[in-house]
């Protein structure tokens, strides 16, 4: 986890695929880039197998640009639509068992601080509403209680979109889904309120139709988690 891991080993550049050479030469590693510069540098995430027009994929692209030091960052995820794109990004990605992403991130975050001391090494969890608010809720909440120094990003599309359309805790009351044909009968979970109650140092909600705000929020979240506690 350093700028060195994305560079070429001497003498091997000519053997590397063009995509890799482009990433080293024109990617964001070791540079300060912004969403306002999209199109002028090679993004960490470009090609992906997500559905055409998926807003979640746009958000993931924006979040990857916003990460302050991508060369010193590990992404952690779990089952869900989002991991199909996250796993294609040029950032180390740890894919845990369903719902254990915040437990994995807790160990990684602590281990990196022990190994590298004061050098900034960031851990960012990115998972869907099912993995975060339902199946992984226990580990998510307790990582917040412990003030673990990493960022948790919930990709809330209000449905288990990868397994047929089941309702989740984050589905809005009354929403009709393939696996909830009569509509959800319960309210959407207040994850923002729960995060505040658990003592997160920084809590925010964003939508991908405001790229500059996405960039600002993600950057703040990672930097605050690095120095203060859970975000």
PLM region descriptions:
Residues 1-5:
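Iron-sulfur cluster-binding cysteine motifs and their immediate structural context
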Residues 8-152, 170-172, 184-185:
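Cofactor-binding active-site loop characterized by glycine-rich and histidine/acidic residues
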Residues 119-124, 135-138, 142-150, 155, ...:
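Glycine-rich ThDP/TPP pyrophosphate-binding loop and its adjacent helix/strand module
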């Amino acid at each position: 986890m350093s700028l060195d891991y994305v560079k070429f080993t001497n003498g091997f550049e000519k053997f590397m695929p063009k995509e890799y050479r482009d990433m080293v030469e024109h990617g964001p590693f070791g540079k300060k880039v912004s969403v306002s510069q999209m199109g002028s540098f090679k993004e960490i995430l470009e090609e992906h197998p997500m559905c055409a027009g998926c807003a979640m994929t746009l958000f993931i692209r924006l979040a990857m640009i916003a990460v302050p030091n991508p060369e010193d960052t590990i992404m952690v995820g779990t089952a869900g639509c989002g991991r199909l794109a996250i796993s294609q990004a040029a950032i180390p990605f740890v894919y845990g068992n369903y719902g254990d992403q915040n437990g994995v991130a807790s160990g990684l975050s602590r281990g990196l601080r022990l190994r590298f001391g004061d050098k900034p090494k960031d851990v960012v969890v990115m998972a869907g509403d099912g993995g975060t608010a339902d199946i992984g809720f226990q580990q998510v909440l307790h990582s917040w209680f412990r003030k673990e120094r990493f960022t948790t990003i919930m990709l809330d599309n209000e449905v288990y979109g990868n397994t047929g359309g089941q309702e989740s805790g984050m589905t809005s009351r009354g929403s009709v889904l393939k696996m909830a044909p009569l509509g959800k009968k319960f309210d959407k979970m207040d994850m923002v309120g729960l995060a505040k109650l658990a003592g997160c140092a920084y809590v925010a909600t964003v939508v991908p139709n405001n790229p500059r705000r996405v960039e600002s929020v993600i950057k703040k979240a990672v930097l605050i988690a690095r120095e203060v506690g859970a975000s």
